[in-house]
């Protein structure tokens, strides 16, 4: 992702560590998860500083939620406990030294499917506001240049055969997003401390909806 300093720094760290391994034998194993989450962290495509609650709040209020492009880019989300299965298989594994591994769910879904799953869990209609990624990247409030234009607006598909081979752990039954998301949503709804108001994001969503509507005229 050339748009995001966070991603460029991670790539630079990998290069540094692998070079040190080649030079001195420094024991390094690189692990690349994909959008790992738990009950306290719900993956959505676009959110503000307060996290996913503001998105759930909009959906429950019958408001539209911003979605980059047409919502059909592919994404992969992995629960922390599923990630841990293969991660533990790499710990102390000499065959993993000097290697890099993906550890991700085998389920690849679109962002439309993500939001429809959330709508079904909440018992509401899915009301997207499709916004071009380049337009979101113009935001002065959020760094959507890196996280959307260079990241979540693009499709990703991962091959986990390497980590299965090296750990000796076969395919596991990864938690489907609809199941993991339900667990997260129920946690959010039952824990008031997770329900953080985010008026800046709400105002941003309303503004983006107005701008997007004007572009369609």
Give the role of each language-model region.
Residues 74, 152-155:
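Glycine/small-residue-rich pyrophosphate-binding loop that anchors the diphosphate of NDP-sugar donors
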Residues 54-78, 90:
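A conserved pocket-lining segment of Rossmann-fold NAD(P)-dependent short-chain dehydrogenase/reductase
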Residues 89-149, 160, 165-166, 175, ...:
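Mid/C-terminal beta-alpha module of Rossmann-like enzyme folds, strongest
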Residues 13, 17, 59, 162-164:
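Structural element of the ATP-grasp superfamily
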Residues 30, 71, 76-84, 100, ...:
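Conserved loop-to-helix N-cap of the C-terminal "lid" that shapes the substrate pocket in Rossmann-like
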